[in-house]
C-alpha cells in the first residue's frame, strides 16, 4: 500500500497483479492521488515479475472524477497541480508496457473515465456508467486526456460524450467501443477480468510492449510535447469565468 493507502496491490498468480484504486468513497481525483498512481504504474511497468495488471475499485463508483466541492475553490497553483496529475497519471497508464485490464464495477465519469480509456481491455459491470462531463462543469480537457480521448474514441463518440457531457450505460458503452465485455454481476466481473488478463499475460511480453508502442507512440509523443510546451501549467489556469458557477450547478443537482 502507498503511504496514503490509496493504492493497494494483490497478487492474482502467474504474474498478474491487481491494482486497486482506493481513495474512498468514490476515487475522486486529486493531484497527489494521480501522481502516486503514475509512479505506481511506472513501477509495475518496469517490474519483470508483473505480466499483466488488473485495475479495479472496491467502491460502488469506479471513479467519479474531480471532487467538485473541492475543485471549485482551486487557486492557480492547485489548478496547475491537478492538470499535471491528469496529464502525468493517464500518460503513465496509456504508455504502460504491460497489459492492463480495467474491471469497471461502477460509474467512471469525467477524469475517472480515463482509467478505462487508457487500459487495453475493458470489462464493464451491467450497472456501470460512463461519461465525460467536463463541458457541463465548465472545464476543457488537458492535453493528456484530450489526446487519449481522440485516440480511443471515434469522432461520433467524441461528439456524443464530449459535447453533451451526458453519461451512457454499459450496452451503449460496448456499442461505442468503450468496453469490450459486460459482466452481469461482480463475481463475473472478477472472473472475466482475470480471464482476459491471463490471455494477455501469455503473449510474448517484449512483442506486446513493442506493438503497443507502435499503436500509441504518436499520441504519447504529442502528449509529451504538449507537456513540454507548458501543458501542465496553462496560462491563466485551467478554469475559466464559467467554471465555478457550472460546478455549483452540478453540485446542487441543477446540472442533471
Provide a role label for each language-model segment.
Residues 56, 103-104:
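Structural motif
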Residues 121, 160, 164-166, 172, ...:
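Well-ordered beta-strand positions
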Amino acid at each position: 500500500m502507498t503511504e496514503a493507502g490509496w493504492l493497494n496491490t494483490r497478487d492474482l498468480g502467474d504474474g498478474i497483479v491487481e491494482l486497486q484504486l482506493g481513495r474512498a468513497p468514490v476515487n475522486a481525483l486529486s493531484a497527489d492521488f494521480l501522481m502516486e498512481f503514475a509512479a505506481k504504474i511506472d513501477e509495475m511497468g518496469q517490474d519483470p515479475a508483473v505480466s499483466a495488471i488488473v485495475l479495479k475499485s472496491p467502491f460502488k463508483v469506479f471513479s467519479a472524477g474531480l471532487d467538485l466541492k473541492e475543485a471549485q475553490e482551486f487557486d492557480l497553483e492547485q489548478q496547475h497541480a491537478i492538470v499535471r496529475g491528469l496529464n502525468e497519471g493517464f500518460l503513465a497508464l496509456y504508455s504502460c508496457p504491460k497489459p492492463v485490464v480495467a474491471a469497471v464495477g461502477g460509474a467512471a465519469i469525467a477524469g475517472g473515465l480515463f482509467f478505462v480509456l487508457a487500459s487495453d481491455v475493458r470489462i464493464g459491470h451491467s450497472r456501470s456508467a460512463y461519461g465525460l462531463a467536463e463541458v457541463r462543469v465548465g472545464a476543457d480537457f488537458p492535453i493528456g486526456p484530450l489526446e487519449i480521448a481522440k485516440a480511443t474514441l471515434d469522432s461520433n463518440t467524441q461528439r456524443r460524450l464530449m459535447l453533451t457531457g451526458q453519461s451512457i450505460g454499459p450496452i451503449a458503452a460496448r456499442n461505442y467501443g468503450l468496453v469490450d465485455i459486460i459482466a452481469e454481476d461482480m463475481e463475473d466481473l472478477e472472473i472475466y477480468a482475470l480471464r482476459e488478463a491471463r490471455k494477455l499475460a501469455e503473449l510474448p511480453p517484449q512483442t506486446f510492449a513493442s506493438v503497443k508502442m507502435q499503436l500509441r507512440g504518436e499520441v504519447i509523443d504529442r502528449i509529451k510535447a504538449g507537456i513540454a510546451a507548458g501543458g501542465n501549467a496553462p496560462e491563466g489556469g485551467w478554469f475559466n469565468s464559467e467554471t465555478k458557477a457550472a460546478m455549483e450547478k452540478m453540485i446542487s443537482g441543477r446540472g442533471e
